[in-house]
Amino acid sequence: MRVVYLNPLGQMGGAEMSLMDLLVSMRAAEPLWEFSLLLGEDGPLVERAQAAGVQVIVAPFPRALARLGDSGGGPVGALWSCLKASVGTIRYALTLRRVLGELRPDIVHTNGFKMHVLGAWAHPENASVIWHIRDYVSTRPLMKRLLRMHAQRCAAAIGNSNSVASDIQTVCGPQLPALCIYNAIDLERYSPSGEKTDLDSLAGLTPAPHGTVRIGLAATLAHWKGHAVFLRALARLPKDLACRAYVIGGPIYQTENSQRTLDQLRAMADELGIADKVGFTGYVADTAGAMRALDILVHASTQPEPFGRVIAEGMACGCAVICSAAGGAVELIAEGQDALAHPPGDEAALAGRMAELVRDPELRARLGRAGRITAERRFERSRLAEEVIPLYQRLSGHPAAQPEAGLANAIGR
């Protein structure tokens, strides 16, 4: 079988790490299948995919297409962005159609809203398109319209949580089958054992005193990831708590108005009077090492989280995790057993949870142990191929496909 994956970015965000987990899982399960990855930009994902034995093709997006999105500007801004991107988008779609024709895939597996639309338009007639949707569609006016328009050209959609799968059905209707396949992670890499990143050095801070409890927020700089809530919660902590905080991550998006800058966050910390309590590392390639350096990992998203990959990673690394209780994130944890939760955007509640964990090392240790057990049970990487392969076989008419165990059963899970 030939499978072509489409992804807009070459940089390593959470969606790209999840895509890599799928590629590795599929390659291990089906070594004789042909896997290709077409990207809209160059970046670290190229080398990682090639190392996994996947053919990589980089077909750079035109600048206007790369910057097209729902972030900021409202309906008028979105319309203007579409008009600016239209000519380049048509040319790109024609190029994509030619490349896909040469690759002759049985399955076109798309990632990212732009590639969902482009893949639906450009795929060969004998190939089935699967949208792997890792975000809510209903909150994006432009992409919602585009996906609804192209849904009839898509054979199935995968949501990375039940929350996302339900959202897909709401937007695209029952004619587009949508199933939930949770993301997975590399449990050998994301483990309590291994080297710890020197976060103080990366952030330009003097080493923290022995016994300091380290609290971190690891995320892209997207507005909704809750950096402002995290910083305001830190400012509420009692001054006598022996803790230091870290903002781990940097900007990765080209879409206009989609993210904060590190300078903006540093200025906010200064205004809150906590500049000496928090460090900013910028982009960190070894996220597992960064998480192992933390005692407490905070997930502070202010909007419902489609999945919350960082939650699974933190649990796998043995961190005591605090997560924002909305969307797919609440599907990942058992509150009070393997993680703590707080209402999205509630800085006072988040501060209370952080203070509770800073003061209680036994609770931190218990949550860390339980979180690792949950990660091993639910997020092991080989599960991805076990769930995706039957879908591929069903849609491509593969002889190994079992009608009664195919897409219909997957949707019913």
Write out the residue ranges for each language-model feature.
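A conserved mid-protein helix/loop that constitutes part of the nucleotide-sugar donor-binding site
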Residues: 16-21, 222-236, 263, 348, ...
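A conserved nucleotide-sugar
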Residues: 30-34, 209-215, 227, 231-279, ...
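Carbohydrate-associated surface elements
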Residues: 163, 184
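Short His-centered aromatic/hydrophobic patch
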Residues: 88-92, 110-116, 133
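Conserved acidic donor-binding segment of nucleotide-sugar-dependent glycosyltransferases
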Residues: 335-336, 340-348, 356-362
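A short helix/loop element that forms part of the nucleotide-sugar donor recognition site in Leloir-type
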Residues: 191-208, 265, 404
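A short, well-ordered alpha-helix in the C-terminal region of glycosyltransferases
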Residues: 349, 356, 363-378, 384-390
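Short hydrophobic beta-strand element within catalytic cores of glycosyltransferases
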Residues: 320-323
